[in-house]
């Protein structure tokens, strides 16, 4: 079973340009789109990203799904897609969205590829802006003292708020816990 918690915050920005996409059937698919960082004419709306992902997320082949996203999105689009099936996780990262995983008391960045999962593993998927006010030590400490995804997210958001009162632009993140 996968427990999850999502966080989306506009900050002082005029609009929310990021997107957090989550489906549970037929596979757990999580995607975070960093639309607020796109400053060129080839902007992709969060709705366009979600629509495209909805079309391809049911594809049984994760690599084919990622190839379609890579082909249809502009080169400067920043996003990360995770798919969890059974005891494995597939990760495809493009740009400033990262996934960090807590395994056996250690925090590691999740690179592109397919990896095994165990009960108790915790995963944070977030935009670069979300990570900018956090340290790896803080993320790990919050993960280790949290029993739920919501509690872990709340502790990290509190750390960000203590630094900038959440006036830092769009913040987008998802926490996942393997049970």
Question: Which positions does each model-derived feature cover?
Answer:
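Catalytic core of PPM/PP2C metal-dependent serine/threonine phosphatase domains
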Residues: 53-102, 160-178
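C-terminal catalytic subdomain
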Residues: 69, 118-124, 129-179
């Amino acid at each position: 079973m996968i427990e999850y918690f999502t966080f989306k915050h506009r900050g002082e920005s005029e609009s929310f340009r990021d997107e957090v996409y989550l489906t549970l059937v037929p596979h757990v698919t999580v995607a975070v789109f960093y639309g607020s960082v796109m400053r060129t004419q080839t902007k992709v709306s969060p709705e366009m990203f979600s629509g495209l992902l909805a079309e391809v997320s049911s594809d049984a082949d994760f690599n084919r799904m990622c190839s379609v996203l890579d082909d249809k999105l502009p080169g400067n689009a920043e996003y990360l897609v995770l798919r969890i099936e059974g005891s494995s996780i597939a990760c495809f990262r493009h740009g400033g969205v990262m996934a960090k995983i807590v395994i056996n008391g250690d925090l590691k960045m999740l690179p592109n590829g397919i990896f095994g999962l165990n009960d108790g593993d915790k995963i944070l998927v977030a935009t670069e802006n979300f990570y900018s006010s956090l340290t790896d030590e803080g993320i790990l400490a919050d993960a280790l003292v949290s029993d739920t995804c919501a509690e872990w997210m709340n502790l990290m958001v509190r750390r960000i708020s203590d630094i900038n009162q959440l006036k830092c632009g769009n913040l987008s993140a998802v926490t996942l816990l393997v049970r």
